[in-house]
């Protein structure tokens, strides 16, 4: 595509590059686009099929935590693990999750039908999504070939991830592997995908010794690759600070970390949220468009009003209707007083700043 005479991509050219209509893009103001963030020289956002300059994805939202492929029994195992942890802590059963879709009807699961998944991605693109991060990895049952096919057919840039999820999902050998062995396994995942982030990297609210070991290895793998890291915290997110501590102790700068699922940590004063932001990390409100929006909106507004908008990341943690962050959650924030400029920063600029990294290792050719 020919670029403008200045050598910089125009707004219209960027929209055409990702196939987005001007009408859809009207939710992203031109002024905010023109005043977008700056990135380090050589920074890229690594998707399955190419490395993008961050500026190339400025024409729409990037969703930093979604799912396109998980094992068929993933949610059953998740519910069982959650129930066991809460029972051990003397807590009542967890309430319904704060966002994301209900279980699909039999025969209508996009994660089992590449045609349906391609349609979901194409719909999200038409609704203003420029890029999606698939937050799965091998121990979650992600089928990378499935993700590749849906990304290719839909034309949506998809970031694949590397990692180990949490104790109930770890391969048995994790308990006997050294941190260095886990680090090397993670780097191999990065090269093989190729991956553009480590995530989601999880723990339950009482972090196990194996989970601490994995977090330290993730930190070492980041130092070797520069890939950003996003995490999974349990309900209500008591492990958030310790997760950041573990990663920082391993040599990770906070600006390369997003502590996830903090919409579940309900606190009108957003004390933990502010603490993490002050340390320089991002925080994820990433289960949007569901029954938890009512608790998330006032917390997001409190953080915006406190000056922490540049530390917020939004997503739905969904496997369909990916654009619900834009179509359902953002209107609620607008009704609460958020303006277009700040919403552009959160949905377009922040995830690009988070995902952009300067590679330390060459990208392997995608087959």
Name every feature range the model reports, one short phrase each.
Residues 67-114, 161-180, 318-330:
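Active-site gating loops and adjacent loop-to-helix segments of metal-dependent hydrolytic enzymes
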Residues 145-148, 172-173, 208-213, 236-251, ...:
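Distinct, well-ordered alpha-helical segments
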Residues 1-10:
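N-terminal secretory signal peptides
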Residues 28-55, 367:
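C-terminal segment of N-terminal export signals and the immediately downstream linker at the start
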Residues 232, 286-288, 309-323:
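Short acidic/histidine-rich active-site segments
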Residues 10-28:
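N-terminal export leaders
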Residues 130-131, 149-153, 157-228, 279-282, ...:
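Active-site gating/metal-coordination segments in enzymes
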